Each structure stands twice: as C-alpha cells, then as structure tokens.
Regions:
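Short loop/turn segments immediately following beta-strands, especially the blade-tip
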Residues: 385-389, 439-445, 494-505
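Recurrent small/Gly-Pro-centered beta-turn motifs in extracellular repeat architectures
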Residues: 318-320, 372-373, 420-422, 479-481, ...
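Conserved blade-ending motifs and adjacent loop-strand segments that build the rim/top face
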Residues: 451-467, 501-525
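Trp- and S/T/G-rich repeat-edge/linker motifs of beta-rich repeat architectures
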Residues: 287, 342-345, 391-395, 448-451, ...
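Beta-rich, blade/repeat-based domains predominating
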Residues: 303-306, 357-362, 405-412, 464-469, ...
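Blade-level signature of beta-propeller repeat domains, shared across WD40, Kelch, NHL, RCC1
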Residues: 489-498, 516-547
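One-carbon transfer enzymes
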Residues: 1-356, 360-369, 381-386, 396, ...
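Short glycine/acidic-enriched loop and turn motifs that connect beta-strands
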Residues: 321-325, 375-378, 423-427, 482-485
C-alpha cells in the first residue's frame, strides 16, 4: 500500500481563519495525507481581513455598511485556535523582520527539508515563499480568491463587481523552486449586491480545494499535478492589485445606484414567473420560433420541465409552485400533451412536506422512474410509477445527508451515471460544482464517486439543465449558465469522454433567453423523440388582473 503524503503547514501564528481550520481538519483526517510539520511564524499576528489594506474613507464606509446588511451564520475569515489535530505535530518557528517579510535562516530551511515533505501548504498566503519551495517535493501550495492573474490581491471580490465581471474566481497556486503556476481554478457567479458575500462564497467553497488536490496528488504518485494555464506566473512578490480609492468608490456608486433603482422598480411593478414552452418535433431545434407557450395561472410557477412519452401522448412533468416562495414549497405536477399539441391542466402527482423540483423522468426495463430534486430533505430520492403518469411510490433513497440539486441519470456502457450539483460546505455556492457517480445497479446502496470529482467547478456550465440525449451515437448534456444569474441560459455540451477514470465535455451550442420574446432567463432543455420542452422566466405586470 502506498505511503501517505507528508504535508507541512506554513502558519502565521496560533490562530487560523475558519476556512483554513476546516480544511486542515479534513487533511488531518484523510486517508491520503499526514500532517507532519507546522512551520509557525513567530512574529506579530497579521490581520486576515483582505479589505483592510486601503486608506480610502469611502471604501471603509462601504465595507461597514456591507457587513451590517449581509451578516452570515458563518464568517470564513473569523479567527479560531489551531485544530486539535495539530497538537502532536512537530513545529518549527520563524521570525519576522520589521518589513513583515519572513526571515528564514539556512538552519530553519534545513530542518524543514529534513522532514522529507511532499507538500507545504501556506495558510498565511501573504509573503514570498520561493526559498521554502525547495523544501517539499511538490512545492508550496496556497489558496487565494481571485483568478490568479487579472484579479488578485487586496479587496478580493470587489473588483469583479466593479468591472461587471459575470464570474468571480478562486484558485490554488503552486510554487516549485521559484516558479509559480495555478493548479486549481474555480469560477462562481459574481454576487453583485454584496462584496462581502461575493468574497465569502469563495472561502467557503475553497475549504475543499486543498484536500481535493492532495487526493489527486496521492493518485498521481510522484508525478506533479498539471497546471491550469499554458505558462507560469513568474512573480513571487507582493500581489499587484491595490484596494479601491475614493475616486473609484464614487464611480462605483454612480454606476450602481441607477441599476439598483431599476432592479427595485422592476421587482415592485412586475412578477417574474417560470413558464413552459415546447415544440412537437423529433429533431433538436435549431430555431425556436415555433414553440408553444404554457402560461401558468397568476402567482404560479411552472419550471424544470421534463418530458416523457407513453403511446401517442406526451407528458411534461414540472415543478409547480404557488407564490410567495416564503410561505409555500413546490410539488411535482404533470401536463398531458397529445400529438396535436392540445394540453390538459396540470395534475399534482407527488407532494411532500419539503420542496420538490426538477422531476427527472426516465424509463428502464418497462417501468418509469423519477428522481426529483429534494435537496431541502438532504436526499436524492428515486420514485417508480405504479400507474404512469399519475401514481408514484418511493423505492429508494439513493443518497442521504447530501445537498444535491438537479440530479440527472444516463445509462452508458453497462453502467448508470449520476450527475448532480452539490454543496459540500455550508454557506458555499450550489451552482458551481458538478459531481459524477456511477453504479451497475440502479437500486444500488453504493454509488462510486468519480475520482475527478467535482468534474466541473464553474458556474457557467456545471449545473444540469435536463435529460442527457443521444445524437448519432454521441451523448449531449444540457447544463445551466449561472454566471450572470441563476439559470440565465443553457449550454449543450458534447460528452467526449466518460469512464471510471476520466470525463471531458465541450460546449457545442448555447441557447439564450433572447430566443423567446419577453424572457430574461432559460434554464431547462428537455428533449425526447418528438418533443422538446424548455422553461422561460417572464415578467408579468403585478397590477393587471388575469394577466
């Protein structure tokens, strides 16, 4: 059996932020790594708040208000004592000079080198580390918000909002013998209404990054992890981007206030609802002019349409929600559509005391099955039709104690493949990370996680958007583009490679809401032979009756 990776930690003192403590705990309790050394800076504690490195009064005021408006149950930057997992770990101490740079003597370097480390993980992430990078076989790794190039440094999460970037990124960089490269890169939707929330989502999601990379490094053995970029980032000096000044804050609010007023006015005057649109055509649509619209009653949503067929009739299963969302939870309904396009009113088929949506329906060995989204119950549930399409029974909880959304299954090469978006860390984003599992039995008690999980970590393409369909022997996976907002548009992705060790897909088409008049979002694409269904987010005037 292969020996565990030997890991050292670079720490700034006797405390670490919440996100780092959780990451350290996972590493210490993993099956692939042992923490064998803590290198502790003996100087003054540093402030981990990335917004403090500025002399702008307006920016400080902005931060003060943002914090009070957007308090969260978890502060990923709150300091806490080192995890107890480090109590028996050997320690080496550094000293800090007046210019705040670490002073590292050859004796200290030798002590670290003698520990025969595979990886050094820098939790401080604030000072040059080139001289330590030769002390570990795979260099020094550090997590940072930002994309590692354009956005990095002070006030992470602010500049992406300032420049109207649809995504805000986080990364892990590696330094080996003075050369820096990015080995992990993840993209989240930019939360434009709060810099604090935009930044914190990165730290909460980032709890998982270093443990994942250690798992990947363990599987590779002595082979280094591949870089996520074509070249290397040469600089090892202080990060280049400064905090915003007073003039930039004036510009920021002059542009932001009109957008905020427009948003508030639109929300006051219009009610936005999901509606279903469908086309009776066997082919994948190349244009969307001929789609029929199923408009729900006032104060009602019909979303996440999933198509099925029996005999000559089609059935569109939907999430049905009576507004307001704060007082109601959605259930699963079905709309019957005949071959002439005549539809019947929706019929409720599954209702539980928790939210249900995304009723993924499929057929196997003569029976119809459904996997609705039940993330509020922290389950992935499998139902079987006892009288299709109106009667269903729960036959299996595929997974428990998971926060998983939009689960989609496909049968390929003798295996069931289960795609689902998951939130691993409380408070982190749900739209960013796609996980893949496989099993040879639909009713299995164990679904094997793919070794590359998450196979996608990008809000622009991760979250499933409907049935995986086959065209000319090739599988295509619809996915949501959640960069601008949740469920903005749909990607059609060609699955180029999928087996127990690898997964690869490329986008071949992009369906935007502008294809459907009046729509501002589109987040489901369900195709079967003879019917394609989508859902669109359309604004309706609040004060016009029977609209």
């Amino acid at each position: 059996m292969r020996s565990k990776l030997r890991v050292g930690l670079l720490l700034d003192g006797a405390t670490v932020p919440y996100w780092a403590a959780r990451s350290i705990e996972r590493i210490a309790r993993s099956d692939v790594a042992d923490i064998v050394l803590a290198v502790i800076d003996g100087g003054t504690e540093k402030d981990v708040d990335p917004t403090r490195a500025t002399e702008s009064f307006l920016y400080d005021t902005h931060i003060w208000f943002d914090r009070r408006r957007n308090e969260q149950s978890i502060d990923p930057l709150a300091l806490e004592d080192l995890p107890r997992d480090l109590d028996k770990v050997g320690r080496v101490y550094l000293k800090r000079t007046a210019d705040t740079h670490r002073t590292i003597s050859e004796e200290v370097v030798r002590k670290i080198y003698e520990r025969d480390l595979d990886v050094l993980i820098d939790i401080g992430n604030v000072t040059p580390l080139g001289e330590l990078s030769r002390c570990a076989r795979h260099g020094v790794w550090s997590f940072s918000p930002g994309d590692g190039e354009k956005y990095d440094g002070h006030s992470p999460g602010f500049w992406e909002i300032y420049h109207n970037e649809p995504v805000t990124s986080a990364h892990v960089r590696r330094i080996i013998r003075g050369s820096t490269s990015i080995i992990y890169l993840s993209h989240s939707h930019t939360i434009t209404r709060s810099e604090k929330r935009n930044r914190e989502q990165l730290y909460l999601k980032g709890i998982s990054f270093l443990p994942r990379l250690l798992n990947e490094q363990y599987a590779l053995g002595r082979e280094p992890l591949p870089s996520k970029e074509s070249g290397t980032v040469a600089t090892l000096g202080p990060l280049p981007r400064r905090g915003p000044g007073n003039l930039e804050m004036i510009s920021f609010y002059l542009r932001r206030w009109p957008r905020d007023l427009h948003f508030l006015a639109k929300r006051a005057l219009f009610e936005e609802r999901w509606a279903v649109q469908y086309s009776l055509d066997s082919k994948i649509p190349s244009t969307y002019d001929g789609f029929n619209t199923l408009v729900p009653p006032p104060h009602t949503w019909w979303g996440d349409p999933q198509a099925a067929q029996q005999d000559d009739d089609f059935y569109i299963f939907v999430e049905e929600l009576v507004l307001p969302r704060s007082r109601n939870h959605a259930h699963i309904s079905v709309i019957k559509v005949d071959h002439d396009g005549i539809h019947e009113p929706p019929v409720t088929v599954i209702e539980k005391p928790y939210h249900m949506s995304y009723p993924f329906v499929f057929e196997w060995k003569g029976s119809h099955y459904m996997v609705p989204e039940t993330s509020n119950a922290r389950t992935i549930e499998l139902y079987e039709a006892t009288d299709f399409p109106y009667q269903w029974k729960l036959v299996k909880q595929i997974m428990n104690e998971v926060e998983a959304v939009d689960t989609t299954l496909v049968r390929r090469n003798g295996l069931w493949w289960l795609f689902t978006n998951m939130r691993e860390n409380h408070g982190g984003p749900i739209n960013d990370e796609l996980f893949l599992f496989y099993s040879d039995d639909l009713l299995s008690d164990h679904w094997e996680p793919h070794p590359l999980n998450p196979i996608i970590t990008d809000a622009r393409s991760a979250r499933p958007a409907g049935r995986i369909f086959e065209l000319d022997g090739v599988l295509y996976r619809p996915s949501q583009d959640c960069a601008r907002c949740y469920g903005y548009a749909v990607n059609i992705n060609r699955i180029q490679e999928m087996d127990e060790k690898s997964y690869r897909e490329t986008r071949t088409a992009y369906v935007e809401p502008k294809e459907f008049p009046g729509a501002s979002r589109l987040h489901t694409f369900s195709h079967i032979h003879g019917l394609t269904a989508v859902d669109t987010y359309i604004a309706r005037p609040r004060f016009i009756p029977n609209r």
